[in-house]
Every structure is written in C-alpha cells, then in structure tokens.
Amino acid sequence: PGHDYKYKNFSQKQITSIIDLSKNLKKKYKIKKENILGHSDIAPLRKKDPGEKFPWKLLNKKKICLWHNLSEKNCKKFRGIKLKNSDNFFQLLFKFGYKPTNNKNEKIKIYKNFQRRFRPQLISSIVDQETYIILKSLV
C-alpha cells in the first residue's frame, strides 16, 4: 500500500522482481541509469511514490539507477542544519531536472520528494545542509 494506506516496506519478492525487470528493460532499450525515474521524480507535485522505502540505493549497487556516492556517516553530521540560502539549493535542484517554480508550497513538495529518493532517513520541509551536499554530488 501507498502513503495513504499505512505505507509498508517492499517485500523481498518485489525487490527481486524490480531488479530483474529493470535490468532487462535497461538492456533491451539501452536506458542510462540517470533515466531510471519514479513517479515522484516526474510528477513531484502530485506523486510521492515509490517513496522513501523504495530501495534506490540497492538498485544503484546493481547498476540500475542514479544514487550519490557519499557516506551516510559523513553526511549525517549536516542533517537538520538549515541551509542559510535555500535559493542556491533550488537553483541546483532545477538544474538537476526538476521543474522550476516560485511557489513555496510546490518547492516544499519537490524538496521532500528529492529527500524521499536520495535521503530517505529524514523527510522534512527544512532545507538542510545534508540534502544540499547530496544534491551537489549529483549535479
């Protein structure tokens, strides 16, 4: 079930299936790992799925999708520390590929979906230094 229905961890069977399917589709259609996206990457104002419990990091280890190469231990010390200038973050986020907006509520939705994908340990509306460091490593 999704976020509105007691969002649960993906089963091992689901994870194995998505790995096998993704590998086959990548090979068949010559898809680059940068182009493997979730609903929330494409429509972050409307979608949250696949969400923070989706195994993006594992899929990256299987050479399926994009993930940052930073250690959680090194990044964690910046978690929750508010970024002084969030405009820099959003300029970089829009450069990364998210649709630009000046609407504050839309920016927060986009930001949270970026966190669901690349920093799933904490989903927050505070634009923090850890998320900025992760984004910088991807752009």
Identify the role of each PLM range.
Residues 1-4:
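Residues forming anionic-ligand binding surfaces in small-molecule and nucleic-acid pockets
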Residues 7-8:
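Feature activates predominantly on carbohydrate-active enzymes
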Residues 12-30, 45-139:
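Cell-envelope/ECM-targeting effectors and their regulatory/trafficking segments
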Residues 28-38:
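Surface-exposed patches in mature extracellular/periplasmic domains of secreted proteins
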Residues 41-43:
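Catalytic metal-binding/acid-base residues of hydrolase active sites
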